[in-house]
Protein backbone atom coordinates (compact mmCIF):
# COMPACT_ATOMS: atom_id res chain seq x y z
CA UNK A 1 0.00 0.00 0.00
CA UNK A 2 2.84 2.39 0.89
CA UNK A 3 4.46 1.74 -2.50
CA UNK A 4 1.18 2.59 -4.27
CA UNK A 5 0.81 5.83 -2.32
CA UNK A 6 4.43 6.78 -3.02
CA UNK A 7 3.97 6.12 -6.74
CA UNK A 8 0.68 8.06 -6.81
CA UNK A 9 2.26 11.12 -5.21
CA UNK A 10 5.32 11.10 -7.46
CA UNK A 11 3.28 10.52 -10.62
CA UNK A 12 0.92 13.38 -9.75
CA UNK A 13 3.76 15.79 -8.98
CA UNK A 14 5.70 14.96 -12.13
CA UNK A 15 2.57 15.23 -14.28
CA UNK A 16 2.14 18.74 -12.91
CA UNK A 17 5.80 19.54 -13.75
CA UNK A 18 6.36 20.66 -10.15
CA UNK A 19 9.44 20.29 -7.97
CA UNK A 20 9.11 18.77 -4.51
CA UNK A 21 9.45 22.27 -3.03
CA UNK A 22 6.75 23.68 -5.29
CA UNK A 23 4.37 20.82 -4.58
CA UNK A 24 4.95 21.11 -0.82
CA UNK A 25 4.21 24.85 -0.84
CA UNK A 26 1.18 24.35 -3.09
CA UNK A 27 -0.20 21.76 -0.66
CA UNK A 28 0.39 24.08 2.30
CA UNK A 29 2.94 21.87 4.03
CA UNK A 30 5.19 23.32 6.74
CA UNK A 31 8.62 24.93 6.37
CA UNK A 32 10.51 21.81 5.32
CA UNK A 33 7.67 20.34 3.31
CA UNK A 34 9.93 19.37 0.42
CA UNK A 35 11.61 16.87 2.75
CA UNK A 36 8.17 15.50 3.62
CA UNK A 37 7.33 15.04 -0.07
CA UNK A 38 10.68 13.33 -0.61
CA UNK A 39 10.01 10.87 2.22
CA UNK A 40 6.51 10.15 0.89
CA UNK A 41 7.83 9.43 -2.59
CA UNK A 42 10.49 7.11 -1.19
CA UNK A 43 7.90 5.28 0.89
CA UNK A 44 9.74 6.17 4.11
CA UNK A 45 6.65 7.80 5.63
CA UNK A 46 2.96 8.04 4.70
CA UNK A 47 0.79 11.13 4.44
CA UNK A 48 -2.19 11.46 6.74
CA UNK A 49 -5.62 10.93 5.24
CA UNK A 50 -6.11 14.68 4.90
CA UNK A 51 -2.70 15.14 3.28
CA UNK A 52 -3.31 12.35 0.78
CA UNK A 53 -6.70 13.84 -0.07
CA UNK A 54 -4.99 17.20 -0.71
CA UNK A 55 -2.59 15.48 -3.12
CA UNK A 56 -5.37 13.67 -4.97
CA UNK A 57 -7.64 16.73 -5.07
CA UNK A 58 -4.93 19.11 -6.30
CA UNK A 59 -6.24 20.23 -9.71
CA UNK A 60 -4.50 18.97 -12.81
CA UNK A 61 -6.74 20.64 -15.39
CA UNK A 62 -6.74 24.40 -16.04
CA UNK A 63 -9.65 26.22 -14.36
CA UNK A 64 -9.73 28.91 -17.08
CA UNK A 65 -9.35 27.24 -20.49
CA UNK A 66 -9.44 29.51 -23.52
CA UNK A 67 -12.84 30.43 -24.94
CA UNK A 68 -12.24 29.69 -28.61
CA UNK A 69 -15.75 30.93 -29.39
CA UNK A 70 -15.01 34.38 -27.99
CA UNK A 71 -16.04 37.06 -30.47
CA UNK A 72 -12.84 39.10 -30.09
CA UNK A 73 -9.37 37.69 -30.61
CA UNK A 74 -6.88 38.93 -28.02
CA UNK A 75 -3.13 38.83 -27.43
CA UNK A 76 -1.58 39.01 -23.97
CA UNK A 77 1.87 40.68 -23.83
CA UNK A 78 4.20 40.76 -20.81
CA UNK A 79 1.58 38.38 -19.52
CA UNK A 80 3.02 37.45 -16.13
CA UNK A 81 0.57 34.99 -14.59
CA UNK A 82 -2.32 36.19 -16.72
CA UNK A 83 -4.13 38.59 -14.39
CA UNK A 84 -5.15 40.83 -17.28
CA UNK A 85 -6.20 37.82 -19.33
CA UNK A 86 -8.34 36.62 -16.42
CA UNK A 87 -10.15 39.97 -16.20
CA UNK A 88 -11.03 39.71 -19.89
CA UNK A 89 -11.79 35.97 -19.66
CA UNK A 90 -14.50 36.83 -17.14
CA UNK A 91 -16.35 38.81 -19.85
CA UNK A 92 -16.80 35.58 -21.89
CA UNK A 93 -16.02 37.65 -24.98
CA UNK A 94 -12.38 36.94 -25.85
CA UNK A 95 -10.40 34.21 -27.56
CA UNK A 96 -6.71 34.48 -26.65
CA UNK A 97 -4.68 33.68 -29.77
CA UNK A 98 -1.19 34.59 -28.50
CA UNK A 99 0.60 35.27 -25.23
CA UNK A 100 4.15 36.21 -24.34
CA UNK A 101 6.07 35.97 -21.04
CA UNK A 102 9.78 35.30 -20.59
CA UNK A 103 9.90 34.24 -16.90
CA UNK A 104 9.84 30.43 -16.68
CA UNK A 105 8.09 30.36 -13.30
CA UNK A 106 5.36 32.76 -14.45
CA UNK A 107 4.98 30.60 -17.57
CA UNK A 108 4.37 27.60 -15.30
CA UNK A 109 1.58 29.38 -13.39
CA UNK A 110 0.08 30.70 -16.63
CA UNK A 111 0.03 27.22 -18.17
CA UNK A 112 -1.49 25.64 -15.06
CA UNK A 113 -4.44 28.05 -15.12
CA UNK A 114 -5.13 28.63 -18.81
CA UNK A 115 -3.68 25.57 -20.54
CA UNK A 116 -1.58 27.76 -22.85
CA UNK A 117 2.20 27.97 -22.61
CA UNK A 118 3.24 31.57 -23.41
CA UNK A 119 5.86 32.32 -26.03
CA UNK A 120 9.10 33.68 -24.62
CA UNK A 121 10.96 36.96 -25.06
CA UNK A 122 8.75 39.32 -27.09
CA UNK A 123 11.79 41.29 -28.27
CA UNK A 124 12.83 38.25 -30.30
CA UNK A 125 9.43 37.69 -31.94
CA UNK A 126 8.71 39.28 -35.32
CA UNK A 127 5.49 41.29 -35.24
CA UNK A 128 4.48 39.76 -38.59
CA UNK A 129 4.43 36.32 -36.93
CA UNK A 130 1.85 37.35 -34.33
CA UNK A 131 -1.74 36.28 -35.14
CA UNK A 132 -4.33 38.85 -36.14
CA UNK A 133 -6.36 40.14 -33.21
CA UNK A 134 -8.89 42.77 -32.19
CA UNK A 135 -7.62 43.43 -28.64
CA UNK A 136 -4.06 43.82 -27.33
CA UNK A 137 -3.32 43.90 -23.61
CA UNK A 138 -0.08 44.28 -21.71
CA UNK A 139 1.99 45.98 -19.08
CA UNK A 140 5.58 47.14 -19.50
CA UNK A 141 8.41 48.44 -17.29
CA UNK A 142 8.49 52.19 -16.69
CA UNK A 143 11.76 53.41 -18.22
CA UNK A 144 13.04 56.72 -19.55
CA UNK A 145 13.35 57.07 -23.31
CA UNK A 146 16.85 57.88 -24.46
CA UNK A 147 15.80 60.58 -26.90
CA UNK A 148 13.09 62.13 -24.76
CA UNK A 149 12.31 65.66 -25.82
CA UNK A 150 13.12 65.25 -29.51
CA UNK A 151 10.45 63.93 -31.88
CA UNK A 152 8.43 62.43 -29.04
CA UNK A 153 7.08 59.71 -31.25
CA UNK A 154 7.43 56.14 -32.44
CA UNK A 155 11.16 56.28 -33.26
CA UNK A 156 12.02 57.62 -29.80
CA UNK A 157 10.76 54.42 -28.18
CA UNK A 158 13.31 52.09 -29.79
CA UNK A 159 15.32 50.03 -27.34
CA UNK A 160 12.53 49.98 -24.75
CA UNK A 161 9.94 47.31 -24.06
CA UNK A 162 7.19 49.79 -24.88
CA UNK A 163 8.60 49.80 -28.42
CA UNK A 164 7.66 46.13 -28.71
CA UNK A 165 4.06 47.00 -27.90
CA UNK A 166 4.15 49.91 -30.36
CA UNK A 167 5.65 47.89 -33.24
CA UNK A 168 3.00 45.19 -32.82
CA UNK A 169 0.20 47.77 -32.74
CA UNK A 170 1.67 49.41 -35.85
CA UNK A 171 1.80 46.10 -37.74
CA UNK A 172 -1.42 44.41 -36.56
CA UNK A 173 -3.66 47.46 -36.00
CA UNK A 174 -5.93 45.96 -33.32
CA UNK A 175 -9.31 47.57 -32.69
CA UNK A 176 -8.43 48.32 -29.06
CA UNK A 177 -5.73 47.98 -26.44
CA UNK A 178 -5.37 48.14 -22.66
CA UNK A 179 -2.00 48.93 -21.08
CA UNK A 180 -1.36 48.96 -17.31
CA UNK A 181 1.49 50.61 -15.46
CA UNK A 182 2.54 52.18 -12.18
CA UNK A 183 0.84 55.43 -11.22
CA UNK A 184 4.18 57.25 -11.35
CA UNK A 185 4.35 56.74 -15.11
CA UNK A 186 2.42 60.01 -15.44
CA UNK A 187 5.12 62.05 -13.73
CA UNK A 188 8.13 59.95 -14.73
CA UNK A 189 11.03 61.97 -16.18
CA UNK A 190 9.03 65.18 -15.63
CA UNK A 191 6.14 63.86 -17.70
CA UNK A 192 8.23 63.20 -20.81
CA UNK A 193 7.90 59.41 -20.62
CA UNK A 194 4.10 59.45 -20.66
CA UNK A 195 4.06 62.18 -23.30
CA UNK A 196 6.12 60.01 -25.65
CA UNK A 197 3.92 56.98 -25.00
CA UNK A 198 0.69 58.90 -25.62
CA UNK A 199 2.06 60.68 -28.70
CA UNK A 200 3.35 57.41 -30.13
CA UNK A 201 -0.03 55.72 -29.75
CA UNK A 202 -1.82 58.72 -31.27
CA UNK A 203 0.69 58.72 -34.12
CA UNK A 204 -0.42 55.14 -34.81
CA UNK A 205 -4.00 56.44 -35.31
CA UNK A 206 -5.46 55.65 -31.89
CA UNK A 207 -7.62 57.74 -29.60
CA UNK A 208 -6.09 57.38 -26.14
CA UNK A 209 -7.90 57.44 -22.81
CA UNK A 210 -6.24 57.04 -19.42
CA UNK A 211 -7.21 57.00 -15.76
CA UNK A 212 -5.79 56.07 -12.37
CA UNK A 213 -7.68 53.58 -10.22
CA UNK A 214 -7.08 52.08 -6.78
CA UNK A 215 -7.74 48.39 -6.19
CA UNK A 216 -9.48 49.17 -2.89
CA UNK A 217 -12.19 51.03 -4.81
CA UNK A 218 -13.05 47.84 -6.72
CA UNK A 219 -13.64 45.49 -3.82
CA UNK A 220 -10.19 44.22 -2.82
CA UNK A 221 -8.53 45.44 0.40
CA UNK A 222 -5.29 46.74 -1.11
CA UNK A 223 -4.21 50.34 -1.67
CA UNK A 224 -2.77 49.73 -5.12
CA UNK A 225 -2.96 52.65 -7.55
CA UNK A 226 -2.21 52.04 -11.21
CA UNK A 227 -2.64 53.91 -14.47
CA UNK A 228 -4.76 52.26 -17.15
CA UNK A 229 -4.34 53.34 -20.77
CA UNK A 230 -7.06 52.43 -23.27
CA UNK A 231 -6.90 53.07 -26.99
CA UNK A 232 -9.26 52.59 -29.94
CA UNK A 233 -8.32 52.49 -33.61
CA UNK A 234 -9.96 55.55 -35.18
CA UNK A 235 -10.72 53.80 -38.47
CA UNK A 236 -12.01 50.52 -37.06
CA UNK A 237 -13.93 51.84 -34.02
CA UNK A 238 -15.79 54.94 -35.15
CA UNK A 239 -17.91 55.20 -31.99
CA UNK A 240 -14.92 55.23 -29.64
CA UNK A 241 -16.14 58.49 -28.10
CA UNK A 242 -18.83 56.41 -26.37
CA UNK A 243 -16.14 54.78 -24.23
CA UNK A 244 -16.07 55.73 -20.56
CA UNK A 245 -14.02 54.24 -17.76
CA UNK A 246 -15.95 52.32 -15.09
CA UNK A 247 -17.17 54.10 -11.98
CA UNK A 248 -15.35 52.77 -8.90
CA UNK A 249 -17.65 50.80 -6.60
CA UNK A 250 -15.99 52.20 -3.46
CA UNK A 251 -17.64 49.56 -1.30
CA UNK A 252 -16.01 49.17 2.10
CA UNK A 253 -13.26 46.57 2.17
CA UNK A 254 -11.82 44.67 5.11
CA UNK A 255 -8.50 42.82 5.35
CA UNK A 256 -10.17 40.04 7.34
CA UNK A 257 -12.10 39.05 4.23
CA UNK A 258 -8.95 37.76 2.50
CA UNK A 259 -7.28 36.09 5.50
CA UNK A 260 -7.10 32.32 5.82
CA UNK A 261 -8.57 30.77 8.96
CA UNK A 262 -5.56 28.58 9.71
CA UNK A 263 -2.00 29.58 8.82
CA UNK A 264 1.21 27.58 9.25
CA UNK A 265 3.81 28.89 11.71
CA UNK A 266 6.35 29.22 8.90
CA UNK A 267 4.74 32.56 8.02
CA UNK A 268 5.32 34.01 11.53
CA UNK A 269 8.33 36.34 11.74
CA UNK A 270 11.29 35.14 13.78
CA UNK A 271 12.33 37.26 16.77
CA UNK A 272 15.43 38.42 14.87
CA UNK A 273 13.47 39.54 11.80
CA UNK A 274 10.72 41.23 13.83
CA UNK A 275 13.25 43.04 16.04
CA UNK A 276 15.09 44.17 12.92
CA UNK A 277 11.90 45.60 11.40
CA UNK A 278 11.14 47.56 14.56
CA UNK A 279 14.70 48.84 14.85
CA UNK A 280 14.79 50.04 11.22
CA UNK A 281 11.46 51.78 11.61
CA UNK A 282 12.79 53.77 14.58
CA UNK A 283 15.99 54.67 12.71
CA UNK A 284 14.03 55.78 9.65
CA UNK A 285 11.61 57.81 11.76
CA UNK A 286 14.52 59.59 13.47
CA UNK A 287 15.98 60.40 10.06
CA UNK A 288 12.65 61.76 8.84
CA UNK A 289 12.05 58.86 6.47
CA UNK A 290 8.64 57.29 6.26
CA UNK A 291 9.73 53.80 5.30
CA UNK A 292 8.99 51.03 7.75
CA UNK A 293 6.89 47.92 8.10
CA UNK A 294 3.12 48.00 7.63
CA UNK A 295 1.11 46.27 10.35
CA UNK A 296 -2.53 45.34 9.73
CA UNK A 297 -5.28 43.30 11.37
CA UNK A 298 -8.57 41.78 10.25
CA UNK A 299 -10.42 45.05 10.82
CA UNK A 300 -8.05 47.18 8.74
CA UNK A 301 -9.87 48.53 5.66
CA UNK A 302 -6.97 47.72 3.33
CA UNK A 303 -3.24 46.96 3.16
CA UNK A 304 -0.30 48.63 1.49
CA UNK A 305 0.57 47.70 -2.09
CA UNK A 306 2.03 44.23 -2.39
CA UNK A 307 5.23 44.33 -4.45
CA UNK A 308 7.44 41.77 -6.16
CA UNK A 309 9.95 42.12 -3.30
CA UNK A 310 7.48 40.86 -0.71
CA UNK A 311 9.24 37.49 -0.59
CA UNK A 312 12.33 39.11 0.97
CA UNK A 313 10.96 40.07 4.38
CA UNK A 314 7.26 40.85 3.96
CA UNK A 315 7.69 44.21 5.65
CA UNK A 316 5.09 46.12 3.63
CA UNK A 317 2.22 43.89 4.77
CA UNK A 318 2.37 42.17 8.16
CA UNK A 319 -0.63 40.69 9.97
CA UNK A 320 -1.02 41.07 13.73
CA UNK A 321 -1.22 37.88 15.80
CA UNK A 322 -2.31 37.89 19.43
CA UNK A 323 0.42 36.64 21.75
CA UNK A 324 2.91 36.20 18.91
CA UNK A 325 5.06 38.07 16.43
CA UNK A 326 3.26 39.29 13.31
CA UNK A 327 3.20 37.09 10.22
CA UNK A 328 3.52 37.50 6.50
CA UNK A 329 0.46 36.95 4.36
CA UNK A 330 0.33 33.57 2.62
CA UNK A 331 0.54 33.21 -1.17
CA UNK A 332 -3.21 32.47 -1.25
CA UNK A 333 -3.88 35.67 0.70
CA UNK A 334 -1.61 37.53 -1.72
CA UNK A 335 -3.69 36.19 -4.60
CA UNK A 336 -6.87 37.37 -2.91
CA UNK A 337 -5.38 40.86 -2.40
CA UNK A 338 -5.18 41.03 -6.19
CA UNK A 339 -8.71 39.69 -6.63
CA UNK A 340 -7.80 36.27 -8.01
CA UNK A 341 -10.50 33.62 -7.46
CA UNK A 342 -9.98 30.85 -4.91
CA UNK A 343 -9.58 28.19 -7.60
CA UNK A 344 -6.59 29.94 -9.19
CA UNK A 345 -3.78 27.38 -9.12
CA UNK A 346 -0.47 28.31 -7.47
CA UNK A 347 1.98 25.67 -8.80
CA UNK A 348 5.22 27.36 -7.68
CA UNK A 349 7.16 27.92 -4.46
CA UNK A 350 6.08 30.59 -1.98
CA UNK A 351 9.00 32.78 -3.06
CA UNK A 352 7.96 32.71 -6.71
CA UNK A 353 4.28 33.11 -5.81
CA UNK A 354 4.98 36.34 -3.90
CA UNK A 355 6.95 37.71 -6.86
CA UNK A 356 4.18 36.75 -9.26
CA UNK A 357 1.28 38.27 -7.35
CA UNK A 358 3.36 41.36 -6.52
CA UNK A 359 4.02 41.83 -10.23
CA UNK A 360 0.44 41.11 -11.27
CA UNK A 361 -2.68 43.25 -11.57
CA UNK A 362 -5.86 43.78 -9.58
CA UNK A 363 -8.19 41.50 -11.53
CA UNK A 364 -11.47 43.25 -10.56
CA UNK A 365 -10.17 46.57 -11.93
CA UNK A 366 -9.14 44.91 -15.18
CA UNK A 367 -12.51 43.18 -15.48
CA UNK A 368 -14.43 46.43 -14.96
CA UNK A 369 -12.40 48.15 -17.70
CA UNK A 370 -12.65 45.08 -19.96
CA UNK A 371 -16.44 45.19 -19.76
CA UNK A 372 -16.37 48.82 -20.92
CA UNK A 373 -13.99 48.05 -23.79
CA UNK A 374 -16.11 45.09 -24.93
CA UNK A 375 -19.27 47.20 -24.68
CA UNK A 376 -17.70 49.88 -26.89
CA UNK A 377 -16.59 47.33 -29.48
CA UNK A 378 -20.01 45.64 -29.43
CA UNK A 379 -21.84 48.89 -30.07
From Swiss-Prot:
Its EC number is 2.1.1.37. GO terms for molecular function: DNA (cytosine-5-)-methyltransferase activity; DNA binding. It holds the Pfam family HTH_3. SUPFAM superfamilies: lambda repressor-like DNA-binding domains (SSF47413), S-adenosyl-L-methionine-dependent methyltransferases (SSF53335). The gene is ssoIIM. Residues 9-66 form the HTH cro/C1-type domain. It comes from the Bacteria. InterPro entries: C5-MTase, C5_DNA_meth_AS, C5_MeTfrase, C5_meth_CS, Cro/C1-type_HTH, Lambda_DNA-bd_dom_sf, SAM-dependent_MTases_sf. It catalyses: a 2'-deoxycytidine in DNA + S-adenosyl-L-methionine = a 5-methyl-2'-deoxycytidine in DNA + S-adenosyl-L-homocysteine + H(+). It is an enzyme of class 2 (transferase). It comes from Shigella sonnei. Belongs to the class I-like SAM-binding methyltransferase superfamily. C5-methyltransferase family. Residues 72-379 form the SAM-dependent MTase C5-type domain. The active site is at 142. Coiled coil: none annotated. This is Type II methyltransferase M.SsoII. Keywords: DNA-binding, Methyltransferase, Plasmid, Restriction system, S-adenosyl-L-methionine, Transcription, Transcription regulation, Transferase. One of its GO terms (biological process) is methylation.
